[in-house]
C-alpha cells in the first residue's frame, strides 16, 4: 500500500476552538445581562425603595 498524505487538522481545530470560545463568551454575556437587568437590578431597586419608604416614615414620625 502506498502511504497517503494526511492533511493536518490544526486549522480546523483552531477554527473550532475560536468558534467555541466565541459562542461561550456570547452566551455568557447574554446570560449575565439577563441576570443583571432581569433579576438583580429589579430586586436591588425594590430593596432600595423599601428602605427609602421606611426612612421617610421614620422621619415623618420624628417630625423632621
Curated annotation (Swiss-Prot):
Which ranges of this chain reside in the Mitochondrial matrix compartment per its record?
A: 1-15
Q: Which residues form a coiled coil?
A: none
Name it: Cytochrome c oxidase subunit 9, mitochondrial
Keywords associated with the record: Membrane, Mitochondrion, Mitochondrion inner membrane, Oxidoreductase, Transmembrane, Transmembrane helix
- Its gene name is cox-17
Stated role: Component of the cytochrome c oxidase, the last enzyme in the mitochondrial electron transport chain which drives oxidative phosphorylation. The respiratory chain contains 3 multisubunit complexes succinate dehydrogenase (complex II, CII), ubiquinol-cytochrome c oxidoreductase (cytochrome b-c1 complex, complex III, CIII) and cytochrome c oxidase (complex IV, CIV), that cooperate to transfer electrons derived from NADH and succinate to molecular oxygen, creating an electrochemical gradient over the inner membrane that drives transmembrane transport and the ATP synthase.
Biological process terms from the Gene Ontology for this record are:
mitochondrial electron transport, cytochrome c to oxygen; proton transmembrane transport
Q: Which residues cross the membrane?
A: 16-36
Biological source species: Neurospora crassa (strain ATCC 24698 / 74-OR23-1A / CBS 708.71 / DSM 1257 / FGSC 987)
Q: Give the Mitochondrial intermembrane membrane side ranges.
A: 37-64
Claim: Membrane is one of the keywords in the record: yes
Amino acid at each position: 500500500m502506498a502511504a497517503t498524505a494526511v492533511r493536518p487538522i490544526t486549522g480546523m481545530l483552531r477554527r473550532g476552538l475560536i468558534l467555541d470560545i466565541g459562542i461561550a463568551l456570547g452566551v455568557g454575556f447574554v446570560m449575565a445581562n439577563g441576570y443583571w437587568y432581569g433579576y438583580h437590578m429589579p430586586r436591588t431597586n425594590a430593596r432600595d425603595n423599601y428602605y427609602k419608604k421606611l426612612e421617610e416614615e421614620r422621619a415623618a414620625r420624628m417630625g423632621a
